[in-house]
Swiss-Prot record:
Official protein name in the record: Minor capsid protein L2
Location relative to the cell: Virion; Host nucleus; Host early endosome; Host Golgi apparatus
Disulfide bridge map: 21-27
Annotated gene: L2
Post-translational modification: Highly phosphorylated.
Species assigned in the record: Human papillomavirus type 54
Length: 470
């Protein structure tokens, strides 16, 4: 991304340059004629005004008075005024003579006018007819309402979401003699509106606790970002970095003792050399932070360095991460208790103890002759880590397990009486005698290893007089 260039500053005006360079005689060639009015244009106007006079036309550069005759205003259309409301004429003025009394009577004259209407006459007889009755029964009106009386009914339904608060009370106390003291409030019906309320239940260590406050969660720790690419990593070995870091940036004031656990701001003079070269041009040192990284406890502070100033007044503030390792964190090895492995030196099988593990099958041919009655079967030809087991038997054909304590499944093994000859063991494994031709040609090459020459394609471009090959 291209950086924005600062706007180019305009040089001083001709008047400012004339005031500074006139005395020293170092003015540019175009400054003195422009200020003193001796340019070619000024001379042409001066010479031309000697023979031609345009003063009466009002085209000069003076004040806009319009010349001798002045400006003539342009004509405007006449406007017609609308008639206003009629004016009430003034009433008759009563003059007061010197002989008139000065007290004005507040009693107004009567304004009743007699129009000569006839006076109504009141008849002497006639009027309303009054009916009398001789019944002495009092007149009683039935004011009982004929509407149906209001009946209030209460119904209850089981809601699995809402739990009645009365069911959440702790268990009642029980006395030593076994009596149970229970006190419950009676539920009375009311005509007011019942609004169901939600109860937030959070089960704690004991049963029956209700609360509407959610479980507080620890706030998430903000990420410091001390090891990003934007920060310069600077290790510090001076112990004063922990107690009084300001002594590494500026010279201490014995009267003032600041708090090193807050953000420190410094005012850098024009010529300043920090006591520690690593803290040169640092004008702000933020609060410390203890972190653990790579097995050590690290004391960190982030500082702002004032390095460059642009023409527009912008100051570049690169950030620096100062850190000091306090102590390593010892690695505790994980100890796992292991059981010792005990190997048995000699393992023998007794027919009486392990008679239910294996079966002995007698051969009728050998039983009649009685030969091999005192033969001993030895299973020692297996070259494995299993222990050698010797089992005496009076018969030749016997199926026995390899070992009594073996975790493997017993495999039936048939033993025959030995004839005294050593079995033939080949010196090397016997493989099938199949001729193998290593340098043969009866194979197929994978298509991915086949090189196919790419030919250049020719596209004809049709023009007015033929085509041109690509």
């Amino acid at each position: 991304m291209a950086k924005a260039r600062a706007p180019r500053r305009k040089r001083a005006s001709a008047t400012q340059l004339y005031q500074t360079c006139k005395a020293s005689g170092t003015c540019p060639s175009d400054v003195i004629p422009k200020v003193e009015g001796t340019t070619i244009a000024d001379q042409i106007l001066r010479w031309g005004s000697m023979g031609v006079f345009f003063g009466g036309l009002g085209i000069g550069t003076g004040s806009g008075t319009g010349g001798r005759t002045g400006y003539i205003p342009l004509g405007r259309p006449s406007t017609t005024l609308e008639p206003g409301p009629p004016v009430r004429p003034a009433g008759a003025v009563e003059t007061v003579a010197p002989s008139d009394p000065s007290i004005v009577s507040l009693v107004e004259e009567s304004s009743v006018v007699d129009v000569g209407a006839p006076t109504p006459t009141i008849p002497s007889q006639g009027g309303f007819e009054i009916a009398t009755s001789s019944d002495a029964t009092p007149a009683i009106l039935d004011v009982t309402s004929t509407t149906t009386p209001i009946r209030v009914s209460i119904t209850s339904h089981d809601n699995p979401i809402y739990t009645e608060p009365s069911l959440l009370d702790p268990p009642p106390p029980v006395q030593m003699d076994g009596r149970v003291l229970v006190s419950t409030s009676t539920l009375q019906s009311s005509t007011a509106e019942n609004i169901p309320m939600d109860t937030f239940i959070i089960m704690q260590d004991h049963i029956g606790t209700t609360t509407s406050t959610p479980i507080p969660r620890p706030p998430a720790r903000p990420r410091l970002g001390l090891y990003s690419r934007a920060l310069q990593q600077v290790p510090v070995q001076d112990p004063a970095f922990l107690q009084q870091p300001s002594s590494l940036i500026t010279y201490d004031n014995p009267v003032y003792e600041g708090n090193p656990d807050v953000t420190l701001h410094f005012e850098q003079p024009t010529i300043h050399n920090a006591p520690d070269p690593a803290f040169m041009d640092i004008f702000a040192l933020h609060r410390p932070a203890l972190t653990t990284r790579r097995g050590v406890v690290r004391y960190s502070r982030v500082g702002d360095r004032a390095t460059l100033h642009t023409r527009s007044g912008l100051q570049l503030k690169p950030r620096v991460h100062f850190f000091q390792d306090l102590s390593p964190i010892a690695h505790v090895p994980e100890e796992i208790e292991l059981h010792p492995l005990i190997s048995a030196n000699n393992t023998s099988i007794n027919n009486g103890l392990y008679s239910d593990i294996y079966d002995v099958y007698a051969d009728t041919d050998f039983a009649d002759t009685g030969g091999f009655s005192s033969s001993t079967v030895s299973h020692s030809s297996v070259q494995t880590a299993l222990q050698t087991t010797s089992i005496p038997s009076q018969y030749g054909n016997t199926t026995v397990p390899l070992t009594a304590s073996s975790p493997y499944t017993p495999i039936p093994t048939s033993f025959r009486p030995s004839s005294g000859h050593t079995p033939f063991v080949p010196a090397r494994p016997i493989f099938p005698q199949t001729p193998i031709a290593v340098n043969g040609g009866d194979f197929y090459l994978h298509p991915s290893y086949t090189y196919v020459r790419k030919r250049r394609k020719r596209f004809p471009y049709f023009l007015a007089d033929g085509y041109v090959a690509a």
